Every structure is written in structure tokens, then in C-alpha cells.
Amino acid sequence: MEKKGQNPDTDIPMVGKSPCVRITGITAEMNLTLVTEFFLIAFTEYPEWALPLFLLFLFMYLITLLGNLGMIILIRLDHRLHIPMYFLLSHLSFMDICYSSVTVPQMLAMLLEHGAALSYTRCAIQFFLFTFFGSIDCYLLALMAYDRYLAVCQPLLYVTIMTQQTRLSLVTGAYVAGLFSALVRTVSAFTLSFCGANEIDFIFCDLPPLLKLACGESYTQEVVIVVFAIFVIPASMVVILVSYLFIIVAIVRMPSAGSRAKTFSTCTSHLTAVSLFFGTLIFMYLRGNSGQSSEKNQVVSVLYTGVIPMLNPLIYSLRNKEVKEALRKFLNRVKLS
């Protein structure tokens, strides 16, 4: 007699909405159902909100693409923006486009289809790309803080230190470090065994929901993941905090209030972006597992994958006279042509 949920020919059981593989050990107690496909179910419990959320996230994604691409083009076209800070900002804008594009299009498809099935390989690729681009984002924000430190605390040496070769080396180092960290964490995460339920109540394949599906011995992989994660978020935060500590000390020592206000204004945009980005990452990844709700995690994930990449061009342009002036001249040229 055939068992419900099994294919009589292949004897492959069905778990959730995906095929799984049954591995038979020496004894019956060692039987495991290993997940070979994941099913994303974020927001599916509210089907009436699917269309409004789809339109909202689509609008946010388009603004993200236009805003960050516009920032890259503006920096490329205006020679006054060919300085280290804007060189780093152009790479940050590019990373924001990539970072958002890894998750948001799939989230849009998930809302339309009331869920999304991902193969094991697709899930691993998405996790790798998200980790890669996110790590580079962290490193670039740290480099921008270091750039501000040099500009404020070492103004006479700034031009000598931040040469074109130095800028390229720093950015290349950020890309290489992000690649290495992403590779190690992805390999560590996907050498875990995932068994039982295959539903991920999240908007993409991220580490916290994946670890909930892990079974068997996972201590070694989790230690490796945590160790390499320390070299991304906490390490970047240390560079940022130390840089701004020196900046604050330098500002306090300035003789006039006008000088202090002018100098601090050059850092406000970056401080705002750092606070938003790292604030959401800390809430998501560096807090304990107790008391976490999937609804809160989904909202926070939308913030750092969709909202913050959309806001960054606004943050760096609204309080920045050089960017606003470059944008005004660009628009005037467009009108005249």
C-alpha cells in the first residue's frame, strides 16, 4: 500500500511544497528527510496586502535604481566630484543597486505568486551574493569614515595619503575581503544539513532562517560563520567609531563655532547613512534569538534591502552643497539641450 505524500516509483516523500530526499541509515531512528528546495512564505499570511505591497516595493526599487544610477552618473560627469569621498560614494551607490537587486525582484515575484520556490543551488547563490554585496557595503562605509578622519584630522596630508592609487587599493581590498568572507560563510552555511520543514518565513535566503532549518552537528560551521561575520559588521563599526571619535575631538578643539559647525556638516550625511544601515544590521544579526518574531524580522529586512538603498542618494545629496550644485548644473544642461 502506497504511503500518502510519496511517489510510488521513486519513493521520494514530499515536504511542504518541495521534493526531499530520504536517507536511510543503519537503523530506522537514523532516517532523515533532507531539504533540496526551499519555499519562501514571507507576507503570504496577508494575501489582501499582496498587490499594495507589490506596488510599494516596485516603486521603492525603481527609485533605488534611478537614484543610485543617477548618483554614479553625476559623480562621473562632474569633475568637481572627482575626489576620494565621491569616488567611494559612487562605489557605495553601485553596491546599493546590486544589494537591492539580489532580493527585491524575487520579493516582488513572491508577492505575485503568494510564495516562491528556490532550489538549493539558487538559495546558496542568493545567500552568497547578498553576503558579498552587503559585506562590501560595510567596508565602504568604514572607508568613508576613514576618509572623513583624514580630511578633518590630517588636512595637510590628506591629498598625499588619499592618492588615486590609494583609493583604488582600498576599494579593491574591500571587494576582495567581501568576496572571501562571502565564500567562507556560504560554504559553511550550505555544508549544514537541512531537514524537516522547508518553509522559510522570510523574504530571501538569509542566515537566521536557514539556521532554524539546520539539523545534526552544526557547531563548527556556526563558529566559522560567526568568526567571519565579526570581520564584517563589528570590524567596520570599530573603524567608524574610532574615526569619528578622533573627528569629534578635532571639532571640539576648533576655536570658532562656525568652524565646528561647518566641519561637522561634512560628516552628517555619512553619519545618517551609517546609523540607518548598521542599526538595522545590529537589530537583525547581533541580537539574541529569544523573542524574535518573523514579522519584525521581515520588516527590518525590508528596511536594509529596500528602504536604505533607496534613501542613500537622498541622504548624500540633500545635505551636500557640492552634489546639489552638480545636479543643478546637470539639469540646466539637459534643459538647454
Indicate where each model-derived feature is located.
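Transmembrane helical core of 7TM receptor-like proteins
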Residues: M1-S337
